[in-house]
């Protein structure tokens, strides 16, 4: 028997997702039955919940394929300029519900599954997250794909089909333990392998220079097998493609020097070639110069460029003159966006193809290459910038090293001509760093090889121009742009918060889903008490639902009427989960000191993964879980304060916690977070932000008014001034009694009685080498948190501020971001055209 419906679920029945036709439901039930029997070969006596999920996924997929084929035919017929988004990460999460929403099928599927006596939410929970990313960079790529399809751009996402995505995080005895994420174990109903487009990728070997040109010979070959996943736009019949490459050994791998005794070993060694796409490197904002990682970076680039050139040659623009293709139109037909420096090898690879294979003169090849590429910078942290050792590149990609040297020589010649005696500038701007062992600076390669370089929030783009790449922006100021990040409102509002999406639609109509700037219309409801109460009711329902989820999944009971104070993101020193933790201990101490004093109840929720080799991040998790143990088991504290470490934070968990959040923690040291996108998701879902003036927080404050965020702490100039003066942590420790108490407790084993010196590394870091100045912002942070508690006691004032934030969040749609890329970088036009589903064109398409 199905569960009774909540108010929110009842309201969903009169919904912007359209009225369900009876024939639709009957069709879906038929299709579901057909797939259960003929695709899964099961009947209801032996079918499991997972079988029912797969039957539903195949049913929904049936509605995608016609649109997918028609979209590709449409592109083949019309030959629009193509956009290629190259990324080593696509953090997609789950696909089923997003597809139903974008195709307008959710209500019909809901009804069909209900009539079959099943629970659609239970089926949705079966789907594995496609965790092919670490955090913000990979999730941004996923949001961008959704927006590009919704805007009708002829766009493709290209990446790697990792067999194992970001590890699953288990917390054992308070420590993070990593487990492999075998996300493909049960199969993936959304992908289609395309063995007919399999391509060779070369490694190692040597370079041969002859009169007729340059050849890269004696290489090892690995095959790249593409898997295509459909990317549906919202209600526009456009379905674009994400193509992910999987590594396969060629059939003669290690068997060319056939030797009877080695046959079995040669077959077993095929694994070595296929390891390239085995696992995602779990580093966020940290460069690890491993050979396998460099192989991954070249693998995706080499396969993708062959594919792009094949598609270009198949189009009417790929005309031939004599023996070769004319590539003059290439940059008018192809835009390639490099998502960070990970796919930077695309620049020398395209040069290799143009010069060595297509026999173009260097100057022509370079002109085409520069016009084709654009580069997005995502971080200013020095430890995150990619610098590959020259000897490794020479071993793995000898021809590419020669090309990089040639690019660098011509680049430096230009600098010498412009700044004749400035030797230091040459050193600073070279693609090759000579200090110590020689390294290639991949960011410099990207800047020199692209026609546009962008940061991802105004403040970040300013830092990029004035500090990190100052010399380059002085040389070519017009090359540098800002494109503030955004999030897709389909996943981050309609899907994760249907109650709020409905409430908004009732007031301002449904068009905001494709034009989020329309949320400004909500300003006219600021004085509407009934609407504010409805807004609060939606939040309360989300909090209840999340509380029930925590109880079921994590066996923790929380107070659903407490303030939900949430910080969920990768664990990193610069994101300052430690500052949050110090505040938690401060609140605990205040309750203990004066238990009768009024205290606004809080549930502090912290979640995120630490890179497996990042000792300090793992210690921070252990500190949080140790503090939680003490706080949650202290009877004097009761339900006033609870601390939850949210295990295995991922996209599907974000969709649950974000709509339930009251207070969003965005507390990185000013000048360290490039943009952040979690901050935007919380804002759109009716949480208030406590944050520093960093990343996109600055623009959020600009849009909503600084008085409608809880802004605290040092600004960029203050941080610079403190650096100049010299940061002395001890001064703050001695001046602030509450801080001193907290640090002493951590230091003397109050939270680790069995091992009093457990946290000595954290204490040592905080006092002697804290690059992110936690103590410097502690006092301002705690005072700001007191203001948060004050406001929370006044629901009307709180909800008014919430509404102001939601009404101001329209700028942060990834649709707006993508329109800006389209206009200012890619030179393509978004299209409102709803692709016709009739099959008037049956031409073979170029996929």
UniProtKB/Swiss-Prot annotation:
GO cellular component: cytoplasm; cytosol; extracellular exosome; extracellular region; ficolin-1-rich granule lumen; secretory granule lumen
Pfam families the record matches: Phosphorylase
InterPro entries: Glycg_phsphrylas, Glyco_trans_35, Pyridoxal_P_attach_site
Domain of life assignment: Eukaryota
Site location (May be involved in allosteric control): 156
UniProtKB keywords: Acetylation, Allosteric enzyme, Carbohydrate metabolism, Cytoplasm, Disease variant, Glycogen metabolism, Glycogen storage disease, Glycosyltransferase, Nucleotide-binding, Phosphoprotein, Pyridoxal phosphate, Transferase
Phosphoserine PTM sites in chain numbering: 15, 524, 561, 639
Modified residues (N-acetylalanine): 2
Subunit structure: Homodimer; enzymatically active. Interacts with PPP1R3B; recruits the phosphatase PP1 which dephosphorylates and inactivates PYGL/glycogen phosphorylase.
Places the protein is found: Cytoplasm, Cytosol
UniProt modified residues of type N6-succinyllysine: 364
Family: Belongs to the glycogen phosphorylase family.
Residues found modified as N6-(pyridoxal phosphate)lysine: 681
Main location: cytoplasm
Catalytic reaction equation(s): [(1->4)-alpha-D-glucosyl](n) + phosphate = [(1->4)-alpha-D-glucosyl](n-1) + alpha-D-glucose 1-phosphate
UniProt function note: Allosteric enzyme that catalyzes the rate-limiting step in glycogen catabolism, the phosphorolytic cleavage of glycogen to produce glucose-1-phosphate, and plays a central role in maintaining cellular and organismal glucose homeostasis.
Record: disease: Glycogen storage disease 6: A metabolic disorder characterized by mild to moderate hypoglycemia, mild ketosis, growth retardation, and prominent hepatomegaly. Heart and skeletal muscle are not affected.
UniProt cross-references to PROSITE patterns, sorted A to Z: PHOSPHORYLASE (PS00102)
EC number: 2.4.1.1
N6-acetyllysine carried by residues: 470, 796
Binding site for AMP: 43-45, 76, 310
Glycosyltransferase found in the keyword field: yes
Residues of the site described as Involved in the association of subunits: 109, 143
Protein name: Glycogen phosphorylase, liver form
A GO molecular-function annotation: glycogen phosphorylase activity
GO BP annotations listed: glucose homeostasis; glycogen catabolic process; glycogen metabolic process; necroptotic process; response to bacterium
């Amino acid at each position: 028997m199905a569960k009774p419906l909540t108010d929110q679920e009842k309201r969903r029945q009169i919904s912007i997702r359209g009225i369900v036709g009876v024939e639709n439901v009957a069709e879906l039930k038929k299709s579901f039955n057909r797939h259960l029997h003929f695709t899964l070969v099961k009947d209801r006596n032996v079918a499991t919940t997972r079988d029912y999920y797969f039957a539903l996924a195949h049913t929904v997929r049936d509605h995608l394929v016609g649109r997918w084929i028609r979209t590709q035919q449409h592109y083949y017929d019309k030959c629009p300029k193509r956009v290629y988004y190259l990324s080593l990460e696509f953090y997609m999460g789950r696909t089923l519900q997003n597809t139903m929403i974008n195709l307008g099928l959710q209500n019909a599927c809901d009804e069909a599954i209900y009539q079959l006596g099943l629970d659609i939410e239970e089926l949705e929970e079966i789907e594995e997250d496609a965790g092919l990313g670490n955090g913000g960079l990979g999730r941004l790529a996923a949001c961008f794909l959704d927006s590009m399809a919704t805007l009708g751009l002829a766009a493709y996402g290209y990446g790697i089909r990792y067999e194992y995505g970001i590890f699953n995080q288990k917390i054992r005895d308070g420590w993070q333990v990593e487990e492999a994420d075998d996300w493909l174990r049960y199969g993936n109903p959304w992908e289609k392998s395309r063995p007919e487009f399999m391509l060779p990728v070369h490694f190692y070997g040597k370079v041969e220079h002859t009169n007729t040109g340059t050849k890269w010979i004696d290489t090892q070959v690995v095959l790249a097998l593409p898997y295509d996943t459909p990317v549906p736009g919202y209600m526009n019949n456009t379905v674009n493609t994400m193509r992910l490459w999987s590594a396969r050994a060629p059939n003669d791998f290690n068997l060319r020097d056939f030797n009877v005794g080695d046959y079995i070993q040669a077959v077993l060694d095929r694994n070595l070639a296929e390891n390239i796409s085995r696992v995602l490197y779990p580093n966020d904002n940290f460069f690890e110069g491993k050979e396998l990682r460099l192989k991954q970076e070249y693998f995706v680039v080499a396969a993708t460029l062959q594919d792009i050139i094949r598609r270009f040659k198949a189009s009417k623009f790929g005309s031939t003159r004599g023996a070769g293709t004319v590539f003059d139109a290439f940059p008018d037909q192809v835009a390639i966006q490099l998502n960070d420096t990970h796919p930077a090898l695309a620049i020398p690879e395209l040069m290799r193809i143009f010069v060595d294979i297509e026999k173009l003169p260097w100057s022509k090849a370079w002109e085409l290459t520069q016009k084709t590429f654009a580069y997005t910078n995502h971080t200013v942290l020095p430890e995150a910038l990619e610098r590959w050792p020259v000897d490794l590149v020479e071993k793995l990609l000898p021809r590419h090293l020669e090309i990089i040297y040639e690019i660098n020589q011509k680049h430096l010649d230009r600098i010498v001509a412009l700044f004749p005696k400035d030797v230091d500038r040459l050193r600073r701007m070279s693609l090759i760093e000579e200090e110590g062992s020689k390294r290639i600076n991949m960011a410099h390669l990207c800047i020199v090889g692209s026609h546009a370089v962008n940061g991802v929030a105004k403040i970040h783009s300013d830092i990029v121009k004035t500090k990190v790449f100052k010399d380059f922006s002085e040389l070519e100021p017009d090359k540098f742009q800002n494109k503030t990040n955004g999030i897709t409102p389909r996943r981050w509002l309609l899907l994760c918060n249907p109650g709020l999406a409905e409430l908004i639609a009732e007031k301002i109509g449904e068009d905001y889903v494709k034009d989020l700037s329309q949320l400004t219309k909500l300003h006219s409801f600021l004085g509407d008490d009934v609407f504010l109460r409805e807004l609060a009711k939606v939040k309360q329902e989300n909090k209840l639902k999340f509380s029930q989820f925590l109880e079921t999944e994590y066996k923790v009971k929380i107070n659903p009427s407490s303030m939900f104070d949430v910080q969920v993101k990768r664990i990193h020193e610069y994101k300052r989960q430690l500052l949050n933790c110090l505040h938690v201990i401060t609140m605990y101490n205040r309750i203990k000191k004066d238990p009768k004093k009024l205290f606004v109840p809080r549930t502090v929720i912290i979640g995120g993964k630490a890179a497996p080799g990042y000792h300090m991040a793992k210690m921070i998790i252990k500190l949080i879980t140790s503090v939680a143990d003490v706080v949650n088991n202290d009877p004097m504290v009761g339900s006033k304060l609870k601390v939850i470490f949210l295990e295995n934070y991922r996209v599907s968990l974000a969709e649950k916690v974000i709509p339930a959040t009251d207070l969003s923690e965005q507390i990185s040291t000013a000048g360290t977070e490039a943009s952040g996108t979690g901050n935007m998701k919380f804002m759109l879902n009716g949480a208030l932000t406590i944050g520093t003036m960093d990343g996109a927080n600055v623009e959020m404050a600009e849009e909503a008014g600084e008085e409608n965020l809880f802004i605290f702490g040092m600004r960029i100039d203050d941080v610079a001034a403190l650096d100049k003066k010299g940061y002395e942590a001890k001064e703050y420790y001695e001046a602030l009694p509450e801080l001193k108490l907290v640090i002493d407790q951590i230091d003397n084993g109050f939270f680790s009685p069995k091992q009093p010196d457990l946290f000595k590394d954290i204490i040592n870091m905080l006092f002697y080498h804290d690059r992110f100045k936690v103590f410097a912002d502690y006092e301002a942070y705690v005072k700001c948190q007191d203001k948060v508690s004050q406001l929370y006691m006044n629901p009307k004032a709180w909800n008014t501020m919430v509404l102001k934030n939601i009404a101001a969040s329209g700028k942060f749609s990834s649709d707006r971001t993508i329109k800006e890329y389209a206009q200012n970088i890619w030179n393509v036009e978004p299209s409102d055209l709803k692709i016709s589903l009739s099959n008037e064109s049956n031409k073979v398409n170029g996929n």
